[in-house]
Design a protein with these regions (language model features):
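N-terminal beta1-alpha1 ligand-phosphate binding loop
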Residues: 2-32
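Glycine/Thr-rich phosphate-binding loops of Rossmann-like dinucleotide-binding domains
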Residues: 14, 57, 91
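Short, glycine/charged-enriched secondary-structure capping and boundary segments
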Residues: 18-21, 50-52, 95-99
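Short amphipathic alpha-helices and their capping/turn segments at secondary-structure boundaries
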Residues: 25, 35, 70-73
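A short beta-strand-loop structural module common to alpha/beta enzyme folds
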Residues: 32-43
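Cysteine-cluster motifs in flexible loop/terminal segments that predominantly coordinate metals
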Residues: 42-75
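Helix-loop-strand module that forms the ligand-binding subsite of alpha/beta enzymes
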Residues: 62-114
């Protein structure tokens, strides 16, 4: 089993990272492999609802100029996904919101039950 931990904090080794590291440590104790991916300050454009991802049929966003397709590829290889983010005005970080919108639109069906 493999779990992908997504760090949506702009602070690379802040509180969110610390919490995800503890989760990774506990998973390792259980014999579960994990990987932490940091998207905090990496460029992520918002979804423009062009629909090209559904026309392509490859579970990828047509815009391949940021971290979105990389994360989708990692998510395909995992059995579970854990997302960590600071909370700003009751929401996750902006980068994480954009990432979630695009990856769920482009490849949402393959993430069912993860």
């Amino acid at each position: 089993m493999k779990v992908l931990l997504i760090n949506g904090s702009p602070r690379r080794e802040g509180n969110t990272y610390t919490a995800l590291c503890e989760v990774a440590r506990q998973l390792k104790v259980q014999g579960i492999e994990s990987e932490i991916v940091w998207v905090g300050t990496r460029p992520v454009r918002g979804c423009i609802a062009c629909g090209k991802c559904t026309q392509q049929g490859d579970n990828r966003c047509i815009f391949d100029d940021d971290v979105t397709n990389e994360v989708i590829g990692k998510m395909e290889q995992c059995d579970a996904i854990i997302v960590g983010s600071p909370v700003y005005w009751g929401q996750p970080s902006g980068q994480l919101l954009c990432l979630q919108q695009r990856m769920l639109y482009a490849g949402g069906a393959m993430f069912k039950d993860k």
